[in-house]
């Protein structure tokens, strides 16, 4: 009876279970259908993009850089185009595949003298799977396993295998080394990346053959590359350099470049103009799309965005004028060498600016090798070398007196021998002959008075000069800050804002004495670059408005021959600051600078500016005392000037350091001749 009941129960329960099972199956099907509906209808675009991203990838490659031209359109740097072997690597290529490709490629290209490292030889040796396996198996356990007995990562194993390879195992023939040279380059290209393979220059027949059989060597093709050639000019040193494809992005700047869309092997400017205008000169990248089949193999490569050459830059400097200034400096320097005055001099430097726009008209330098006597162009030295300026900075000292309420207008002070308690007297160059007498600010510039500057510097310390006075130095630091602050308004001891990286801001010591402070007032302590001195005098010429010097006039496109095309962007002047003195005080400086060149007093210091000048010149002389190797006394014979006096269109600074011919004030003559040259090339109104 019980058995019969059980059978009845079981027969009734089977349909219930089947119904439950069918319900679950139907529910699962509904879920799947709902999910498919969500994927294929509601979120179709998302999944189509995801599928596409899994079956295709994009790669970019750089194009030729823009070029650099002088103000007249003459090239300073050019691209030399060439046909090269390119390699695009798929993610399926093994070391064995790369070895086979290198072997085939070597039959079509020439390799003169491969320069290989032991690491490259070891990489090639271990590219054989059997050799690599045996090498790893032969490693001691601590080189294969970690402390827990687990196998080390593949990268650690590989490095240990490389370290274990003996030099005797790397004995290859010259032909094999050529193959290894190609293999190393192929192996350095990342998955889905494209790299240039270095070979000897390809001839037309090699290009044609490689292009025709490229299908036999997966990833190999012919493309156009370029070499950067800096032409031999007097401006070569400021052009800068570009990294090679092998070097790629500088390590210290790689992260910043990658964020901008660069690739690791992109060639970029690494110094001076090439670096400053990197984004302008860099070509537009080409974009290619690699399509993969369902197995992940490269199926096709499509160009979706063509690359193009970068934009060009044209300088403010006319190479003809620059070369003439260089020749002028060299002539003066050779003359001083002949009379013995320049034996210990490092060279001579000059900068010419447009005071209103900041355009650099020339930045010339002649470098003197003290060991060999060789003279070489050194335009870069105008922004990297620093010198003691001498009296040319006295207008800035007077300005500091005005700014801080120590001087008032064309104030008269007594030019006299300055004697502090326990120290030697400080004199102007004429004090012993003429004694004490009153002079104005204009005359202090015209005569180049040291003692006027010393009394101004004392005033910044809150003290008035008395003979044999004791000087308290409690205000020394604040006084130096005031003086240097005014100097900085003129561009002295601070960045000029020039469009070149790594300019020197001068040598401005943090440690100094009272004597250093006093002599700094007449230009005998802090050191400045010729460019800073040029900006200083340009600021005076421009009524106190300091404008950043700039070497680049504008950005230009390319013509149909990839040369200098139409103007894209005219670069505008950048005003940095205005010197904090009144217009009437600035006119006093103008009067003083004019009198330096045109004054009729027996104490006038700069008549050489105007003797033979083609236009009216205003300026300031400067002599900084120094000593050379054998203890012989020397001077830095410096000068700053602008012209025409009533409508300045050029401002010039000249530095001639360590001239032992103490009676030859050659600086003003050089400045005058530079202005005369400019008048001939670019007549001024």
Question: What feature does the model see in each segment?
Answer:
Residues 2-279, 285-298, 305, 368, ...:
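Membrane-proximal periplasmic segments of bacterial cell-envelope enzymes
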Residues 37, 392, 396:
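Active-site His/Glu-centered metal-binding helix of metallohydrolases
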Residues 48-60, 321-343:
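Short, basic/aromatic recognition patches
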Residues 65-69, 217-221, 335-353:
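Short N-terminal helix-loop-first-beta-strand/juxtamembrane motif that initiates sensory/input modules
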Residues 75-77, 83, 291-306, 317, ...:
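Beta-lactam-recognizing serine transpeptidase/beta-lactamase-like catalytic domain environment
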Residues 96-107, 208, 212, 236, ...:
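Solvent-exposed, polar/charged alpha-helical surfaces in well-ordered, non-transmembrane soluble domains
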Residues 679-685:
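Gram-negative outer-membrane assembly/targeting C-terminal domains
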